[in-house]
Every structure is written in C-alpha cells, then in structure tokens.
Amino acid sequence: GTVMLWYTPKEVTSSDGSTKTMYDMWIGGENGVLQTGTNASGMFAYLTNIEKLDLSKLDTTYITNMSKMFYMSSGLKSIDLSNFNTSNVTNMNGMFWGCSSLASLDLKTFNTSKVTDMNNMFAECSNITELDLSNFDTSNVTTMGNPYSYGYGGMFRNCKSLKKLNVSSFNTSKVKYMSNMFQGCSSLTSLDLSNFD
C-alpha cells in the first residue's frame, strides 16, 4: 500500500536566541489508514525536530513489539495515541524513553493485558507532570525495573517533573524486576503502592 506523510514546518526560537525548524507530522495510508506489521520497535525513534505527531490513522492491531517506539524523540510535545490498539502488545520496554519535551500523555485507550516488559517505558520523560495509568492491566508484567546489575533501568526513572502518578491498579504479582523503578522522581510527594505485591 501507499504511505502518506503530511507535515507543517515552523520556525522555533530557543532560549539562547537560535532558531530551528520544527514540524507537526501526520501519517496515513490508502483509504486514510496505514496498517503496521508486528514489530514497531524504534518506529518513531529520534524525532528531535517533530513537535506534534498524529497517529490517529495508524492501525496498530497486529503490533506485538512497541519497544523504544518513540525512543529519544526529544522534540515531541504531543502524540495522538487515541486510536492505538495495543491488545496484542507484549513489549513496551522504553516506549517513551527520552521523550523529554512531552508534558502529558493520554494512555486511557491502552490495553496492556499481554504486556510482560515495561522497563524504561517512561524513563527520562522529564517534562511530564502527571500520569494516570489507572487503566493499566499489569497482571502479566515481569519487568518494571532494571533486570541487570549494570546499565539503566526503571519504568519511571528520572521523570523529575512528575508530581502525580496513579498506579493504584497495578498488579505486580508476576514482577521479578523493580529496581530503580522510581529513581530520580524528585517531584513526587506521594505514591500509593498499597496494591503492590
């Protein structure tokens, strides 16, 4: 099929006075919808000059791997995930890792019932102030933290602006790795972990 990409350029002035071109981007396909395969790992990684990403026309029904899907996309301020079908996804490791310009994420439509790996999922999302994950089904998750004695890990690691985090629905009965899960979340003042096993 055909992949279609629309974009709108705009000049942005940085705090140091320099300017650079940033883009808003929309993706679609024939009949308006673009169907993906099973592996979306790194699909939108390193989008440093894209501010807005509209994925409402992306059919994600068959994806099982969303690891690092938006990895280090530090320019992103907004992602439309309203039509994301995540019912077959097993791997969300590092999905939003390093999306340091995102101020918010609406994940209310996410079905995480098959996901086993959420390590680094929101790591270094340093601008996000609130995350409501009350709809997350984590009953099959085994990894939320660093499974190794070296390197980086932790589902919310260095989310330094995060003030509100709702993980009240988390089922951690199968989780083996939680180390560094909240490391560097220096703005969190309260956290309800009463359901954690």
Task: Name these PLM-found stretches.
Residues 1-197:
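Negatively charged
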